[in-house]
Amino acid sequence: MILLSNDRPLHRHVHLQCGSAASAILLLAMGPSFRRLVLKFSTPRLINVNIYAQGMQENEETWLPHLLGFILPIVTISGIYMGGWWCFSGFVYALGLCPIIDYFAPEISPTRAEVAKGPWNSLLFAHGLFFCASIGILLWRANLDGFTVPVILGGLSVGIVGGISGIINAHESGHRKKGSMIWRVARVNLFLVLYSHFTTEHNHGHHRNYATELDPASSPEGRGLWTQIVLTIPAQYKSAWKTHSTKGKTGISNPILHTTLLQLAFLGILFYISSSVMYAFLVQAALAIILLEYVNYMQHYGLRREVGERHTEMHSWEHRGIWSRWTLLELPLHPAHHLKASTPMWDLKAYEKSPQLPSGYYVCFWLAIVPPVWKRVMRKKLQAYSL
């Protein structure tokens, strides 16, 4: 147990229960500025830094830490504007630096007293605008330079922004009132990654069938990420189409057909402007979709219930690490989202009995893209929970 003061003349301390010597050393090495940052968003409670937390520590939080989520789009937009190899800066930040921060970040269950919805809704709206801006500057750079290696790297950077500020944001906003401004921003974001059918399939298919054999987004144990991606993308599209068909919207009246044709028309417009512009757009959309399906894959991997069986907090993987939570709009508190889909992100909570991922979302990405490693790590986790 390590006791760190806040380096100010206040009678307040934060106790850091470290799961490893490395965690403790890192936190100490970061010095007073880091400790002040932690304290700024903390109340004097236990903050658990153990990657495999045995208990659930709580901490009262506000919306302010979620401003960290804007680092990625700002870095990406700035890098593409500067051009050259700077176009890759968003990718390096998100999948290079963030996994390191994520690995050492404390695991904390958030608590919030009375919540003002305005700032939280503004976060969602801002994420949507940042994604649109990142798309715009990528297409500008592609039109200026052509489909060069730096532009491809810029497309990968924007793809990560699309996976977070675009799709994760749309995931949250897609559960809001249909026709509201935030809901409309979500529709635009999904259109810009060529995945407009996501809200239909997610809300009407996935939430009903998750962790069962009927859900194409829930992977059984033993299936690798790349196999899952190949199988789930067409299956989810088909499921979304079927959802509307069962409501009488068949053939040319099916909304999925309409959005598909609109997306194809948009690609045609981009190609008319420049083939380089269209190719850059496709690069970002492809990576954004891959990241979405990686998240789906990870969130329910190996967790199974029978069709019709009541769902519980044991049917989704959870992670309480502050870096993943703060930069991914509380998405890692996934069991709470499935227990009540209408719960906004600021009301999501951790569950003591929920199975815990081996690390945060950024770290798990590198595990998942190497299927043998992922399967070995998750086999141990599933055995630990007797699943």
Range-by-range predicted roles:
Residues 104-116, 304:
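Membrane-helix interface/capping segments
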Residues 112-113, 118-230:
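Intramembrane catalytic core of multi-pass membrane enzymes that act on lipidic substrates
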Residues 55-76, 178-256, 281, 287-387:
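Cytosolic/stromal cytosol-facing helical appendages immediately following the last transmembrane segment
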Residues 7, 11-15, 50:
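Intrinsic-disorder-associated, low-complexity terminal segments enriched in Asp/Asn/His/Tyr and depleted
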Residues 35-36:
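Compositionally biased, intrinsically disordered low-complexity segments enriched in Pro/Arg/Gln/His
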Residues 57-103, 118-143, 149-163, 252-296, ...:
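Alpha-helical bilayer-embedded segments of polytopic membrane proteins, i.e.
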